[in-house]
Amino acid sequence: MSAIRPAAVVVLAAGEGTRMKSATPKVLHELCGRSLVGHVLAAAGELDPENLVAVVGHAREKVTAHLAEVAPDVRTAVQEQQNGTGHAVRMGLEAMGGAVDGVVVVVCGDTPLLTGETLKALAATHTADGNAVTVLTAEVPDATGYGRIVRDGASGAVTAIVEHKDASESQRAIREINSGVFAFDGQLLADALGKVRTDNSQGEEYLTDVLGILREAGHRVGASVAGDHREIAGINNRVQLAEARRILNDRLLTGAMLAGVTVVDPATTWVDVTVTFEQDVVVHPGTQLHGTTHLAEGCEVGPNTRLTDTRVEAGARVDNTVANGAHVGPQASVGPYAYLRPGTRLGLKSKIGTFVEAKNSSIGEGTKVPHLSYMGDATVGDFTNIGAASVFVNYDGQDKHHTTIGSHCRTGSDNMFVAPVTVGDGAYTAAGSVITKDVPPGSLAVARGQQRNIEGWVARKRPGSAAAKAAEAVSREADGED
Protein backbone atom coordinates (compact mmCIF):
# COMPACT_ATOMS: atom_id res chain seq x y z
CA MET A 1 0.00 0.00 0.00
CA SER A 2 1.22 3.49 -0.79
CA ALA A 3 1.77 5.94 2.05
CA ILE A 4 -1.21 8.12 2.92
CA ARG A 5 -0.63 11.60 4.27
CA PRO A 6 -3.39 12.34 6.79
CA ALA A 7 -5.01 15.72 6.93
CA ALA A 8 -4.56 15.62 10.70
CA VAL A 9 -3.42 13.53 13.62
CA VAL A 10 -5.15 14.28 16.92
CA VAL A 11 -3.30 13.12 20.05
CA LEU A 12 -5.44 12.80 23.19
CA ALA A 13 -3.32 14.02 26.11
CA ALA A 14 -5.84 15.61 28.47
CA GLY A 15 -6.30 12.86 31.05
CA GLU A 16 -5.22 13.13 34.67
CA GLY A 17 -3.92 9.59 35.09
CA THR A 18 -4.91 9.21 38.75
CA ARG A 19 -3.73 5.59 38.88
CA MET A 20 -0.15 6.76 38.34
CA LYS A 21 -0.39 8.40 41.78
CA SER A 22 1.97 11.16 40.76
CA ALA A 23 2.26 14.94 40.67
CA THR A 24 3.59 14.51 37.14
CA PRO A 25 0.92 14.34 34.42
CA LYS A 26 0.66 10.79 33.10
CA VAL A 27 1.68 11.61 29.54
CA LEU A 28 4.89 13.26 30.78
CA HIS A 29 6.23 10.19 32.55
CA GLU A 30 9.52 9.09 31.02
CA LEU A 31 10.07 5.88 29.08
CA CYS A 32 13.48 5.09 27.58
CA GLY A 33 14.51 8.71 27.33
CA ARG A 34 11.27 10.16 26.03
CA SER A 35 7.91 11.08 27.55
CA LEU A 36 4.91 8.86 26.87
CA VAL A 37 3.34 11.53 24.68
CA GLY A 38 6.73 12.16 23.09
CA HIS A 39 6.78 8.59 21.83
CA VAL A 40 3.27 9.00 20.41
CA LEU A 41 4.20 12.26 18.70
CA ALA A 42 7.27 10.62 17.18
CA ALA A 43 5.12 7.82 15.74
CA ALA A 44 2.52 10.32 14.51
CA GLY A 45 5.25 12.42 12.93
CA GLU A 46 6.20 9.50 10.68
CA LEU A 47 2.83 9.99 8.95
CA ASP A 48 3.87 13.54 8.00
CA PRO A 49 0.36 14.88 8.70
CA GLU A 50 -0.72 18.26 7.42
CA ASN A 51 -1.83 19.11 10.97
CA LEU A 52 -0.65 17.70 14.29
CA VAL A 53 -2.88 18.57 17.24
CA ALA A 54 -2.56 17.56 20.89
CA VAL A 55 -5.57 17.93 23.14
CA VAL A 56 -4.50 18.97 26.65
CA GLY A 57 -6.46 19.38 29.84
CA HIS A 58 -5.09 18.26 33.19
CA ALA A 59 -1.94 20.26 34.10
CA ARG A 60 -2.13 21.79 30.65
CA GLU A 61 0.58 24.39 31.35
CA LYS A 62 3.16 21.66 32.03
CA VAL A 63 2.00 19.52 29.14
CA THR A 64 1.87 22.43 26.69
CA ALA A 65 5.37 23.56 27.66
CA HIS A 66 6.67 20.04 27.14
CA LEU A 67 4.96 19.73 23.77
CA ALA A 68 6.53 23.00 22.61
CA GLU A 69 9.93 21.60 23.53
CA VAL A 70 9.68 18.15 21.95
CA ALA A 71 7.38 18.90 19.00
CA PRO A 72 7.47 22.60 18.04
CA ASP A 73 5.08 22.02 15.13
CA VAL A 74 2.31 20.61 17.30
CA ARG A 75 -0.82 22.68 17.81
CA THR A 76 -2.59 22.44 21.17
CA ALA A 77 -6.30 22.34 21.87
CA VAL A 78 -7.65 22.73 25.40
CA GLN A 79 -10.27 20.46 26.92
CA GLU A 80 -11.27 22.51 29.96
CA GLN A 81 -13.26 19.65 31.48
CA GLN A 82 -12.60 16.01 30.74
CA ASN A 83 -15.96 15.23 29.15
CA GLY A 84 -14.90 12.13 27.28
CA THR A 85 -12.87 11.14 24.26
CA GLY A 86 -15.51 12.32 21.79
CA HIS A 87 -15.50 15.76 23.35
CA ALA A 88 -11.67 15.81 23.28
CA VAL A 89 -11.60 15.05 19.55
CA ARG A 90 -14.21 17.75 18.97
CA MET A 91 -11.90 20.24 20.74
CA GLY A 92 -9.08 19.08 18.48
CA LEU A 93 -11.12 19.69 15.34
CA GLU A 94 -12.21 23.11 16.58
CA ALA A 95 -8.54 24.05 17.01
CA MET A 96 -8.18 23.41 13.27
CA GLY A 97 -11.26 25.44 12.41
CA GLY A 98 -13.80 22.61 12.41
CA ALA A 99 -14.26 19.81 9.90
CA VAL A 100 -11.16 18.66 8.04
CA ASP A 101 -11.09 17.27 4.51
CA GLY A 102 -9.16 14.02 4.36
CA VAL A 103 -8.07 11.35 6.80
CA VAL A 104 -8.02 12.19 10.51
CA VAL A 105 -6.08 9.80 12.75
CA VAL A 106 -6.85 9.81 16.47
CA VAL A 107 -4.32 8.33 18.90
CA CYS A 108 -4.04 8.18 22.67
CA GLY A 109 -1.17 10.00 24.34
CA ASP A 110 -0.42 7.10 26.68
CA THR A 111 0.38 4.41 24.05
CA PRO A 112 4.17 4.79 23.75
CA LEU A 113 4.78 1.43 22.06
CA LEU A 114 2.77 2.39 18.99
CA THR A 115 4.95 2.59 15.87
CA GLY A 116 4.79 4.80 12.84
CA GLU A 117 4.60 1.72 10.62
CA THR A 118 1.41 0.59 12.34
CA LEU A 119 -0.16 4.03 11.94
CA LYS A 120 0.84 4.08 8.27
CA ALA A 121 -0.83 0.70 7.78
CA LEU A 122 -3.98 2.00 9.52
CA ALA A 123 -4.21 5.05 7.23
CA ALA A 124 -3.51 2.97 4.13
CA THR A 125 -6.14 0.36 5.02
CA HIS A 126 -8.66 3.07 5.78
CA THR A 127 -8.18 4.66 2.35
CA ALA A 128 -7.93 1.41 0.36
CA ASP A 129 -11.11 -0.04 1.89
CA GLY A 130 -13.09 3.17 1.52
CA ASN A 131 -14.05 3.19 5.19
CA ALA A 132 -15.74 6.02 7.02
CA VAL A 133 -13.83 4.93 10.11
CA THR A 134 -11.16 2.32 10.63
CA VAL A 135 -10.30 1.09 14.10
CA LEU A 136 -6.86 -0.22 14.98
CA THR A 137 -7.31 -3.61 16.60
CA ALA A 138 -5.12 -6.40 17.92
CA GLU A 139 -5.40 -10.10 18.67
CA VAL A 140 -4.45 -10.65 22.31
CA PRO A 141 -3.92 -13.85 24.32
CA ASP A 142 -6.28 -12.65 27.06
CA ALA A 143 -8.95 -10.10 26.18
CA THR A 144 -10.37 -9.78 29.69
CA GLY A 145 -11.39 -6.20 30.39
CA TYR A 146 -11.07 -5.01 26.79
CA GLY A 147 -13.72 -3.93 24.31
CA ARG A 148 -14.31 -6.73 21.77
CA ILE A 149 -14.42 -6.17 18.01
CA VAL A 150 -17.54 -7.77 16.54
CA ARG A 151 -17.36 -8.27 12.78
CA ASP A 152 -19.86 -9.12 10.05
CA GLY A 153 -19.25 -12.75 9.13
CA ALA A 154 -19.60 -12.15 5.40
CA SER A 155 -17.91 -8.80 4.76
CA GLY A 156 -15.53 -8.64 7.70
CA ALA A 157 -16.73 -5.12 8.45
CA VAL A 158 -16.86 -4.06 12.09
CA THR A 159 -20.42 -4.14 13.36
CA ALA A 160 -19.81 -3.19 16.99
CA ILE A 161 -17.31 -2.64 19.78
CA VAL A 162 -18.71 -4.36 22.85
CA GLU A 163 -17.26 -3.60 26.27
CA HIS A 164 -16.30 -6.59 28.37
CA LYS A 165 -19.00 -6.02 30.98
CA ASP A 166 -21.66 -5.93 28.28
CA ALA A 167 -20.38 -8.86 26.20
CA SER A 168 -22.20 -12.17 25.83
CA GLU A 169 -20.40 -15.47 26.36
CA SER A 170 -19.76 -15.84 22.64
CA GLN A 171 -18.51 -12.27 22.39
CA ARG A 172 -16.17 -12.77 25.35
CA ALA A 173 -14.50 -15.55 23.38
CA ILE A 174 -13.39 -12.95 20.81
CA ARG A 175 -9.70 -12.06 21.18
CA GLU A 176 -9.68 -9.09 18.81
CA ILE A 177 -9.83 -5.90 20.87
CA ASN A 178 -10.22 -2.17 20.40
CA SER A 179 -7.05 -0.07 20.77
CA GLY A 180 -8.67 3.34 20.99
CA VAL A 181 -6.78 4.40 17.85
CA PHE A 182 -8.85 5.32 14.79
CA ALA A 183 -8.70 6.71 11.27
CA PHE A 184 -11.74 8.76 10.22
CA ASP A 185 -13.08 10.55 7.21
CA GLY A 186 -12.70 14.11 8.50
CA GLN A 187 -16.05 15.46 7.31
CA LEU A 188 -18.01 12.43 8.50
CA LEU A 189 -16.23 12.56 11.86
CA ALA A 190 -17.23 16.18 12.45
CA ASP A 191 -20.85 15.46 11.52
CA ALA A 192 -21.05 12.39 13.76
CA LEU A 193 -19.47 14.12 16.75
CA GLY A 194 -22.35 16.59 16.68
CA LYS A 195 -24.73 13.67 17.22
CA VAL A 196 -22.91 11.99 20.12
CA ARG A 197 -25.05 11.93 23.27
CA THR A 198 -24.05 11.88 26.93
CA ASP A 199 -26.82 9.58 28.19
CA ASN A 200 -24.41 7.03 29.66
CA SER A 201 -23.20 6.14 33.13
CA GLN A 202 -20.31 8.61 32.94
CA GLY A 203 -22.25 11.44 31.32
CA GLU A 204 -19.48 11.79 28.74
CA GLU A 205 -19.13 11.94 24.97
CA TYR A 206 -17.64 8.62 23.85
CA LEU A 207 -15.63 8.57 20.63
CA THR A 208 -16.66 4.95 20.09
CA ASP A 209 -20.28 6.11 19.69
CA VAL A 210 -19.21 7.67 16.39
CA LEU A 211 -18.76 4.18 14.95
CA GLY A 212 -22.39 3.28 15.60
CA ILE A 213 -23.63 6.61 14.27
CA LEU A 214 -21.70 6.19 11.01
CA ARG A 215 -22.73 2.57 10.60
CA GLU A 216 -26.41 3.41 11.12
CA ALA A 217 -26.02 6.07 8.43
CA GLY A 218 -24.89 3.35 6.01
CA HIS A 219 -21.16 4.02 6.10
CA ARG A 220 -18.55 1.28 6.28
CA VAL A 221 -16.66 0.68 9.52
CA GLY A 222 -13.46 -1.32 9.07
CA ALA A 223 -10.43 -2.46 11.04
CA SER A 224 -6.67 -2.67 10.69
CA VAL A 225 -4.99 -5.33 12.82
CA ALA A 226 -1.69 -4.44 14.53
CA GLY A 227 1.06 -6.98 13.97
CA ASP A 228 2.13 -6.90 17.62
CA HIS A 229 -0.64 -6.59 20.19
CA ARG A 230 1.79 -5.02 22.68
CA GLU A 231 1.91 -1.85 20.55
CA ILE A 232 -1.56 -0.80 21.60
CA ALA A 233 -0.96 -1.13 25.34
CA GLY A 234 -1.95 1.97 27.28
CA ILE A 235 -0.11 3.08 30.42
CA ASN A 236 -2.32 3.59 33.45
CA ASN A 237 -0.05 2.75 36.40
CA ARG A 238 3.60 2.25 37.34
CA VAL A 239 3.41 -1.51 36.81
CA GLN A 240 2.34 -1.01 33.19
CA LEU A 241 5.01 1.67 32.80
CA ALA A 242 7.70 -0.78 33.91
CA GLU A 243 6.39 -3.46 31.55
CA ALA A 244 6.34 -1.00 28.64
CA ARG A 245 9.91 -0.01 29.47
CA ARG A 246 10.97 -3.65 29.33
CA ILE A 247 9.22 -4.18 25.99
CA LEU A 248 10.62 -1.04 24.39
CA ASN A 249 14.11 -1.68 25.76
CA ASP A 250 14.01 -5.18 24.31
CA ARG A 251 12.88 -3.76 20.97
CA LEU A 252 15.75 -1.27 20.95
CA LEU A 253 18.39 -3.81 21.95
CA THR A 254 17.11 -6.36 19.44
CA GLY A 255 17.47 -3.77 16.69
CA ALA A 256 21.00 -2.96 17.86
CA MET A 257 22.03 -6.61 17.99
CA LEU A 258 20.64 -7.30 14.52
CA ALA A 259 22.71 -4.33 13.32
CA GLY A 260 25.95 -5.82 14.64
CA VAL A 261 26.14 -4.84 18.32
CA THR A 262 27.00 -7.43 20.98
CA VAL A 263 24.83 -7.00 24.07
CA VAL A 264 26.15 -9.54 26.55
CA ASP A 265 23.09 -9.46 28.82
CA PRO A 266 20.02 -7.68 27.42
CA ALA A 267 18.16 -8.23 30.69
CA THR A 268 20.49 -5.85 32.56
CA THR A 269 21.24 -3.38 29.76
CA TRP A 270 19.06 -0.29 29.35
CA VAL A 271 19.06 2.21 26.50
CA ASP A 272 17.16 5.31 25.43
CA VAL A 273 15.56 5.63 22.01
CA THR A 274 18.04 8.38 21.13
CA VAL A 275 21.15 6.23 21.69
CA THR A 276 23.03 5.17 18.54
CA PHE A 277 25.54 2.42 17.81
CA GLU A 278 28.02 1.41 15.15
CA GLN A 279 29.02 -2.15 14.32
CA ASP A 280 31.07 -4.42 16.58
CA VAL A 281 30.33 -2.48 19.75
CA VAL A 282 30.33 -4.66 22.88
CA VAL A 283 28.03 -3.72 25.77
CA HIS A 284 28.58 -5.57 29.04
CA PRO A 285 25.98 -6.27 31.79
CA GLY A 286 24.69 -3.51 34.03
CA THR A 287 25.14 -0.77 31.45
CA GLN A 288 22.76 2.19 31.04
CA LEU A 289 22.96 4.37 27.93
CA HIS A 290 20.99 7.62 27.93
CA GLY A 291 20.34 10.72 25.87
CA THR A 292 22.40 11.27 22.74
CA THR A 293 25.08 8.75 23.68
CA HIS A 294 26.86 7.29 20.65
CA LEU A 295 29.10 4.21 20.66
CA ALA A 296 31.47 4.03 17.70
CA GLU A 297 32.77 0.95 15.94
CA GLY A 298 34.54 -1.62 18.08
CA CYS A 299 34.34 0.23 21.38
CA GLU A 300 33.58 -1.68 24.58
CA VAL A 301 31.42 -0.37 27.41
CA GLY A 302 30.69 -1.78 30.86
CA PRO A 303 30.05 -3.60 33.01
CA ASN A 304 28.16 -1.36 35.44
CA THR A 305 28.52 1.81 33.42
CA ARG A 306 26.13 4.76 32.95
CA LEU A 307 26.68 7.07 29.99
CA THR A 308 24.54 10.14 29.30
CA ASP A 309 25.00 12.35 26.22
CA THR A 310 28.46 10.85 25.81
CA ARG A 311 30.34 9.87 22.66
CA VAL A 312 32.72 6.91 22.80
CA GLU A 313 34.97 6.66 19.75
CA ALA A 314 36.22 3.58 17.93
CA GLY A 315 38.17 1.05 19.95
CA ALA A 316 37.80 2.85 23.27
CA ARG A 317 37.17 0.97 26.52
CA VAL A 318 34.92 2.33 29.29
CA ASP A 319 34.64 0.21 32.44
CA ASN A 320 32.55 0.79 35.60
CA THR A 321 32.21 4.47 34.81
CA VAL A 322 29.67 7.29 35.05
CA ALA A 323 29.94 9.85 32.25
CA ASN A 324 27.75 12.80 31.33
CA GLY A 325 28.40 15.05 28.36
CA ALA A 326 31.85 13.60 27.74
CA HIS A 327 33.81 12.66 24.61
CA VAL A 328 36.04 9.58 24.86
CA GLY A 329 38.59 9.50 22.06
CA PRO A 330 39.62 6.56 19.88
CA GLN A 331 41.28 3.69 21.77
CA ALA A 332 41.10 5.61 25.03
CA SER A 333 40.74 3.76 28.33
CA VAL A 334 38.41 4.89 31.11
CA GLY A 335 37.92 3.35 34.55
CA PRO A 336 37.20 1.39 36.50
CA TYR A 337 35.35 3.74 38.85
CA ALA A 338 35.88 6.94 36.90
CA TYR A 339 33.52 9.92 36.71
CA LEU A 340 33.50 12.07 33.58
CA ARG A 341 31.48 15.25 33.91
CA PRO A 342 30.28 17.60 31.15
CA GLY A 343 32.93 19.09 28.92
CA THR A 344 35.46 16.29 29.39
CA ARG A 345 37.33 15.35 26.20
CA LEU A 346 39.84 12.51 26.03
CA GLY A 347 42.34 12.20 23.20
CA LEU A 348 43.57 9.23 21.19
CA LYS A 349 44.89 6.38 23.39
CA SER A 350 44.55 8.49 26.51
CA LYS A 351 43.70 7.08 29.93
CA ILE A 352 41.49 8.10 32.83
CA GLY A 353 42.04 5.53 35.54
CA THR A 354 40.66 4.32 38.84
CA PHE A 355 38.81 6.85 41.01
CA VAL A 356 39.52 9.79 38.73
CA GLU A 357 37.00 12.61 38.25
CA ALA A 358 37.27 15.02 35.34
CA LYS A 359 35.13 18.07 34.58
CA ASN A 360 35.33 20.52 31.67
CA SER A 361 38.81 19.27 30.87
CA SER A 362 40.63 17.91 27.85
CA ILE A 363 43.63 15.61 27.73
CA GLY A 364 45.69 14.95 24.65
CA GLU A 365 46.90 11.89 22.81
CA GLY A 366 48.55 9.27 25.00
CA THR A 367 48.12 11.29 28.19
CA LYS A 368 47.37 9.38 31.38
CA VAL A 369 45.62 10.31 34.61
CA PRO A 370 45.84 6.88 36.19
CA HIS A 371 44.77 7.13 39.84
CA LEU A 372 42.82 8.95 42.52
CA SER A 373 42.73 12.43 41.02
CA TYR A 374 40.41 15.37 40.36
CA MET A 375 40.85 17.36 37.16
CA GLY A 376 38.60 20.40 36.82
CA ASP A 377 38.79 23.12 34.16
CA ALA A 378 42.07 21.93 32.72
CA THR A 379 43.86 21.37 29.44
CA VAL A 380 46.62 18.76 29.30
CA GLY A 381 48.74 18.19 26.21
CA ASP A 382 49.98 14.98 24.61
CA PHE A 383 51.91 12.13 26.24
CA THR A 384 51.82 13.63 29.72
CA ASN A 385 51.52 11.59 32.92
CA ILE A 386 49.65 13.01 35.91
CA GLY A 387 50.79 11.47 39.20
CA ALA A 388 48.44 9.73 41.61
CA ALA A 389 46.33 11.76 44.03
CA SER A 390 46.64 14.99 42.06
CA VAL A 391 44.10 17.78 42.47
CA PHE A 392 43.46 20.60 40.03
CA VAL A 393 42.35 23.36 42.38
CA ASN A 394 40.03 25.30 40.11
CA TYR A 395 37.66 27.14 42.47
CA ASP A 396 38.59 30.06 44.71
CA GLY A 397 35.19 30.24 46.38
CA GLN A 398 33.85 32.69 43.82
CA ASP A 399 35.21 31.91 40.35
CA LYS A 400 36.49 28.91 38.41
CA HIS A 401 40.01 29.13 36.97
CA HIS A 402 41.88 27.16 34.32
CA THR A 403 45.01 25.02 34.55
CA THR A 404 47.17 24.25 31.51
CA ILE A 405 49.73 21.45 31.49
CA GLY A 406 51.79 20.95 28.37
CA SER A 407 52.91 17.89 26.43
CA HIS A 408 55.46 15.31 27.62
CA CYS A 409 55.18 16.47 31.24
CA ARG A 410 55.61 14.28 34.32
CA THR A 411 53.86 15.48 37.45
CA GLY A 412 54.55 13.87 40.80
CA SER A 413 52.11 12.15 43.08
CA ASP A 414 50.04 14.21 45.48
CA ASN A 415 50.38 17.44 43.51
CA MET A 416 48.01 20.36 43.74
CA PHE A 417 47.75 22.73 40.80
CA VAL A 418 46.26 25.98 42.08
CA ALA A 419 44.64 27.68 39.10
CA PRO A 420 45.24 29.78 37.17
CA VAL A 421 48.58 28.13 36.49
CA THR A 422 50.54 26.78 33.51
CA VAL A 423 53.08 23.96 33.40
CA GLY A 424 55.17 24.17 30.23
CA ASP A 425 56.02 21.38 27.80
CA GLY A 426 58.46 18.79 29.10
CA ALA A 427 58.35 20.06 32.68
CA TYR A 428 58.45 17.89 35.80
CA THR A 429 56.94 18.53 39.22
CA ALA A 430 58.08 16.86 42.42
CA ALA A 431 55.84 14.65 44.54
CA GLY A 432 53.87 16.50 47.20
CA SER A 433 54.20 19.87 45.50
CA VAL A 434 51.63 22.65 45.60
CA ILE A 435 52.08 24.41 42.27
CA THR A 436 50.95 28.03 42.50
CA LYS A 437 53.27 29.61 39.92
CA ASP A 438 53.84 28.88 36.26
CA VAL A 439 56.49 26.24 35.54
CA PRO A 440 58.72 26.98 32.52
CA PRO A 441 59.17 24.29 29.85
CA GLY A 442 61.74 21.66 30.76
CA SER A 443 61.94 22.74 34.41
CA LEU A 444 61.57 20.76 37.63
CA ALA A 445 59.22 22.42 40.10
CA VAL A 446 59.59 21.59 43.79
CA ALA A 447 57.10 23.31 46.08
CA ARG A 448 57.07 21.67 49.49
CA GLY A 449 58.53 22.14 52.94
CA GLN A 450 61.80 20.37 53.78
CA GLN A 451 61.57 17.24 55.91
CA ARG A 452 62.84 17.59 59.53
CA ASN A 453 63.32 14.53 61.77
CA ILE A 454 62.99 15.19 65.56
CA GLU A 455 64.91 12.41 67.29
CA GLY A 456 63.34 10.83 70.41
CA TRP A 457 60.02 12.71 70.02
CA VAL A 458 57.85 9.61 70.55
CA ALA A 459 59.65 8.52 73.74
CA ARG A 460 59.27 12.01 75.20
CA LYS A 461 55.71 12.79 74.05
CA ARG A 462 54.18 9.28 74.05
CA PRO A 463 56.03 7.41 76.79
CA GLY A 464 54.82 3.86 77.36
CA SER A 465 52.97 3.72 74.04
CA ALA A 466 53.31 0.79 71.66
CA ALA A 467 55.17 3.08 69.28
CA ALA A 468 57.64 4.07 72.00
CA LYS A 469 58.20 0.44 72.99
CA ALA A 470 58.77 -0.59 69.36
CA ALA A 471 61.31 2.20 68.88
CA GLU A 472 63.04 1.27 72.16
CA ALA A 473 63.30 -2.35 71.06
CA VAL A 474 64.94 -1.34 67.81
CA SER A 475 67.35 0.88 69.75
CA ARG A 476 68.30 -1.99 72.11
CA GLU A 477 68.88 -4.30 69.16
CA ALA A 478 71.11 -1.68 67.58
CA ASP A 479 73.04 -1.24 70.84
CA GLY A 480 73.48 -5.02 71.10
CA GLU A 481 74.91 -5.18 67.63
CA ASP A 482 77.39 -2.50 68.59
From Swiss-Prot:
Pfam families: NTP_transf_3 (PF12804). Mg(2+) binds at residues 110, 236. Its main location: cytoplasm. Gene3D superfamilies: Hexapeptide repeat proteins, Spore Coat Polysaccharide Biosynthesis Protein SpsA, Chain A. Its cofactor is Mg(2+). Pathway: Nucleotide-sugar biosynthesis; UDP-N-acetyl-alpha-D-glucosamine biosynthesis; N-acetyl-alpha-D-glucosamine 1-phosphate from alpha-D-glucosamine 6-phosphate (route II): step 2/2; Nucleotide-sugar biosynthesis; UDP-N-acetyl-alpha-D-glucosamine biosynthesis; UDP-N-acetyl-alpha-D-glucosamine from N-acetyl-alpha-D-glucosamine 1-phosphate: step 1/1; Bacterial outer membrane biogenesis; LPS lipid A biosynthesis. Binds 1 Mg(2+) ion per subunit. One of its GO terms (cellular component) is membrane. PANTHER family: BIFUNCTIONAL PROTEIN GLMU, NUCLEOTIDYL TRANSFERASE. This is Bifunctional protein GlmU. It comes from Streptomyces coelicolor (strain ATCC BAA-471 / A3(2) / M145). The lineage of its organism: Bacteria, Bacillati, Actinomycetota, Actinomycetes, Kitasatosporales. The gene is glmU.
